[in-house]
Amino acid sequence: MTLNQLLQKLEATSPILQANFGIERESLRVDRQGQLVHTPHPSCLGARSFHPYIQTDFCEFQMELITPVAKSTTEARRFLGAITDVAGRSIATDEVLWPLSMPPRLKAEEIQVAQLENDFERHYRNYLAEKYGTKLQAISGIHYNMELGKDLVEALFQESDQTDMIAFKNALYLKLAQNYLRYRWVITYLFGASPIAEQGFFDQEVPEPMRSFRNSDHGYVNKEEIQVSFVSLEDYVSAIETYIEQGDLIAEKEFYSAVRFRGQKVNRSFLDKGITYLEFRNFDLNPFERIGISQTTMDTVHLLILAFLWLDSPENVDQALAQGHALNEKIALSHPLEPLPSEAKTQDIVTALDQLVQHFGLGDYHQDLVKQVKAAFADPNQTLSAQLLPYIKDKSLAEFALNKALAYHDYDWTAHYALKGYEEMELSTQMLLFDAIQKGIHFEILDEQDQFLKLWHQDHVEYVKNGNMTSKDNYVVPLAMANKTVTKKILADASFPVPSGDEFTSLEEGLAYYPLIKDKQIVVKPKSTNFGLGISIFQEPASLDNYQKALEIAFAEDTSVLVEEFIPGTEYRFFILDGRCEAVLLRVAANVIGDGKHTIRELVAQKNANPLRGRDHRSPLEIIELGDIEQLMLAQQGYTPDDILPEGKKVNLRRNSNISTGGDSIDVTETMDSSYQELAAAMATSMGAWACGVDLIIPDETQIATKENPHCTCIELNFNPSMYMHTYCAEGPGQAITTKILDKLFPEIVAGQT
């Protein structure tokens, strides 16, 4: 079967860039002095027996971060960024991730084999330590996984003379593997980033600096007698099987090639079930990147892989691959500033890249990538290993690496309430995703704009919207809670205290009600909105003008409006999950405190500068506005936004204390009497709600609440209650909610970890 010139036959509009990607990143845990740690793998990361994203490689201190399959290089890096964020915030606070492929200074006896549950995996690692030594096992890197797109493969198949798709794909991936190994020196030259080994790593003297220790024969390679042919897939499979039978290898995965066929559990299955994708294993960690690999590297490698498919297969595969290995070794061992040797036929690569880009009409971005490759071929200063040279001090990169590790650690803890790469999602969803990754629950974002997730563990699938809307709530429950009139009736029927009042569907009806409430304290609010929108509170009797303004504000949010009695006391939010109160929050209305110098408008701006404040529920606290509601509130107190407040004078900008309208959050879970927590839970249960926010007005929290004498009034129940405000509070310890959501959805994971 010949695949030469097949790519050239495709139409220019063919989906040449279509592919699936995955990244595996290895990294060592070290302390803040750059010394290897001896702590066990973090227990908060769940069981390594099933964790899909965070594992340990050879050593107990060597983390392996594994992305899900992504449809683009950008998404793969986004996944890796999030998993790196989770890993960085799951290890001990005095630990960081080492950003280099070569480990810090170490001794063989320091290296502890990963303490895995699987007996074979432990035995396998002990075997490797005995055979290859433990120091080599501490070398880390990046594995770049790629599957050609389904439509691209189909287009190539249609251009071929083949009738068997599995055989065709096997031949396609075999050709890619052959040319990748033939030209692997390109990867070593461009992206090698392990120019030195720290003192004591090798027993013998080795020349340094070099382009890549890891990608030379000084790195993690098989014994010289292990020679596997890539002439055919059958040859490949049979050779490895023979080495295992002879005892030269203990398992198929002990064959350490720069490229590995993937998609089946055993190699022989490739012959009849097919290769699914390729794993390219020869990438050094890029220490200039927090996640170890840059976007341009990902995309350049993608182009190079396609160029390898564009190029013809070698006529003599074994000879070409042997020459490729020798050239790679020469380039890996050479000084980072040494030009490429004459036998490195860069023109073959450049021509293939140019023709590929031209044939498929790829745009400026990919054309620039090709220009960068050409420039690096001409000037070694532009290669990654050369860029590391200025940071070598006394034959060591330890100081540079530690500074980078600490900087990346600090970045992970910046805006620690968010999930890196997913900051545009609603904050509670980000927190749930963080915990899902940490626990080892598979995830897929079905609709990012709609905050819709698919979570699964083994065969158990759950769908989650907005962080806590799940199958545990039936369809009618959120509808009932969205309707404040229905909520009041259900609670009243269950003998729970609710405020009295009436409902209106027009401004005229509401105004006609004024004579009945003109001397009363009242609340005007939309019937069916959440987050405190459109609510006005009058603790003193309202003038007709202010009452009309409040009605207009409420009608701007809904077609029906409630006018209720004002209940004096302090408002608390109770978070109820599955019949149990998990958190209690005191919310203080949006406010400013004067300093005798600045206007109210300026004080609001100062308070909004707090990094915890943001918009659209993507930060723990919300930006304080100075809109109609706030200015009405100021007017009732005799102020305008441009007035200067006396020092120490506190002015509320809202009467409602929702965090979503600029309020402050104070966690009082530990001090709130359990009687109120139980009462709030009973209210949620009466609604049939699984996840629910219960808002209670409590005049005196020292009084014990009972069903007969509740000493409180329920002013609202909220479906899809915010969770972040209970966790990241302005004051108090905070309560983790999203972890409990996941524990309820996947109790088998909790059981498996205890």
Swiss-Prot record:
InterPro entries: ATP-grasp, Gln_synth/guanido_kin_cat_dom, Glu_cys_ligase, Glut_biosynth, Glut_cys_ligase, GshAB_ATP-grasp. It comes from the Bacteria. Its EC number is 6.3.2.2, 6.3.2.3. Mn(2+) 2 binds at E716, N718. ATP binds at residues 515-573. GO terms for cellular component: cytosol. Residues 488-746 form the ATP-grasp domain. Residues 1-332 are annotated as: Glutamate--cysteine ligase. GO terms for molecular function: ATP binding; glutamate-cysteine ligase activity; glutathione synthase activity; metal ion binding. Coiled coil: none annotated. It catalyses: L-cysteine + L-glutamate + ATP = gamma-L-glutamyl-L-cysteine + ADP + phosphate + H(+); gamma-L-glutamyl-L-cysteine + glycine + ATP = glutathione + ADP + phosphate + H(+). Its cofactor is Mg(2+); Mn(2+). Pathway: Sulfur metabolism; glutathione biosynthesis; glutathione from L-cysteine and L-glutamate: step 1/2; Sulfur metabolism; glutathione biosynthesis; glutathione from L-cysteine and L-glutamate: step 2/2. Mg(2+) 2 binds at E716, N718. Mn(2+) 1 binds at D695, E716. Mg(2+) 1 binds at D695, E716. It holds the Pfam family ATP-grasp_6. NCBIfam families: glu_cys_lig_rel, PRK02471.1. This is Glutathione biosynthesis bifunctional protein GshAB. It comes from Streptococcus thermophilus (strain ATCC BAA-250 / LMG 18311).
